[in-house]
């Protein structure tokens, strides 16, 4: 039956019934290799079709078509600067009728800047806060919670802006600024997470921070486990905390089932950092399977060894993510009350850098 049908169709065909042949597309290059700095490239296009156009896959690519006529012209490709330390790729598709021709675009990774780190460590992630006006949503996540969510703190954490339009986070003059302010009777502030879904396991992590002033402030640079289930069993690492009621005294703490402040077994240390609320100072952690050490301006703040006592004492062999926040009041920040006349206040961060062993 199929053979007969094919024979009848074949016998009844004529030249006028032949399908229109697919258009042929030619381009003078089928690949673009761009440096991290980016650049502009021109690709010549011709087609036997009646018209042509392009489709772009890659947010770092901008393409414009300059038509000589319906069957020829140039594609102008703009490749944006790559600030990430990863190679990235995109694809430009030229279309004419049912025909397709692709142009592959590959861009080199940005070179890792030379930053000071312990010997044997290399930079794996950083944010210098020198691009744009808001945090990169691919790297950072805002917490959203109402007041008294934790530690009896008085602030409401919101995503970028308060209901009245006040910014709780912004990038300005090369710094991340976390603002805490009062609006319509409520306190608003920011709490942000770096790489909350993947975090890092071990490394040297450093931030440069200028702390806010005022009775009631409670800024922190700390870490929590990616796969969090319960506290303190899963651990908490406080690289730096300060409360405005005790200005310029910064502390580091480790929390676990075997050492927690609720039963006065916490692992913590406090030191005076002159000008912590007036200038930028560095706060860091060097974290391995064997030991955790925190630093203030390169000086050891706290050092704690893995004593081989199990997870109750050392739940720090899992990935943790970085947290920056500015709390107001609460069990510690408001232990002697708060002074709302200090508001608004700002915590400034110059950079966050993560290094791991090569």
Predicted regions and their residues:
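Bacterial Sec-dependent N-terminal signal peptides
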Residues: 4-31, 102-120
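Solvent-exposed, low-complexity, repeat-rich "mucin-like" stalks and linkers
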Residues: 26-55
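Short strand-edge motifs at loop-to-beta-strand transitions and within beta-strands
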Residues: 41, 73-77, 269, 281
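Surface-exposed binding patches on compact interaction domains or structured appendages
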Residues: 47-76
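Short, surface-exposed loop/turn segments at beta-strand-coil junctions that are enriched for proline
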Residues: 80-86
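A short beta-strand micro-motif common to beta-rich folds, especially ectodomain repeats
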Residues: 86-98
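GH16 jelly-roll
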Residues: 111-358
């Amino acid at each position: 039956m199929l053979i007969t049908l094919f024979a009848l169709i074949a016998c009844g065909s004529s030249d006028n019934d032949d399908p229109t042949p697919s258009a042929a597309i030619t381009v003078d290059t089928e690949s673009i290799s761009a440096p991290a700095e980016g650049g502009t490239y021109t690709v010549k296009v011709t087609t036997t079709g009646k018209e042509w156009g392009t489709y772009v896959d890659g947010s770092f690519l901008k393409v414009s078509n300059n038509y000589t006529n319906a069957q020829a012209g140039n594609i102008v490709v703009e490749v944006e600067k790559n600030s990430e330390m990863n190679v990235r790729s995109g694809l430009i598709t030229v279309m004419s009728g049912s025909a397709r021709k692709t142009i592959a675009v590959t861009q080199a990774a940005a070179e890792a800047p030379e930053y000071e780190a312990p010997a044997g460590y290399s930079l794996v992630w950083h944010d210098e806060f020198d691009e744009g006006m808001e945090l990169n949503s691919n790297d950072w996540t805002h917490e959203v919670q109402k007041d008294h969510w934790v530690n009896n703190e008085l602030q409401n954490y919101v995503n970028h802006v308060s209901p009245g339009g006040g910014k709780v986070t912004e990038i300005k003059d090369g710094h991340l600024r976390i603002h805490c302010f009062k609006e319509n009777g409520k306190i608003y502030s920011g709490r942000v997470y770096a790489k909350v879904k993947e975090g890092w396991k071990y490394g040297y992590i450093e931030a440069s921070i200028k702390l806010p002033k005022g009775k009631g402030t409670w800024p922190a640079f700390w870490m929590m486990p990616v796969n969090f289930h319960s506290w303190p069993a899963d651990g908490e690492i406080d690289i730096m905390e300060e409360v405005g009621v005790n200005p310029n005294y910064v502390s580091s703490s480790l929390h676990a089932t075997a050492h927690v402040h609720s039963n006065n077994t916490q692992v913590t240390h406090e030191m005076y950092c002159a000008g912590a609320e007036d200038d930028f100072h560095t706060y860091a952690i060097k974290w391995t399977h064997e030991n955790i050490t925190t630093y203030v301006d390169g000086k050891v703040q706290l050092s704690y060894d893995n004593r081989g006592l199990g997870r109750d004492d050392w739940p720090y062999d899992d990935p943790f993510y970085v947290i920056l926040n500015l709390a107001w009041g609460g069990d510690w920040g408001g232990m002697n009350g708060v002074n709302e006349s200090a508001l608004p206040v700002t915590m400034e961060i110059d950079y966050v850098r993560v290094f791991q062993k090569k």
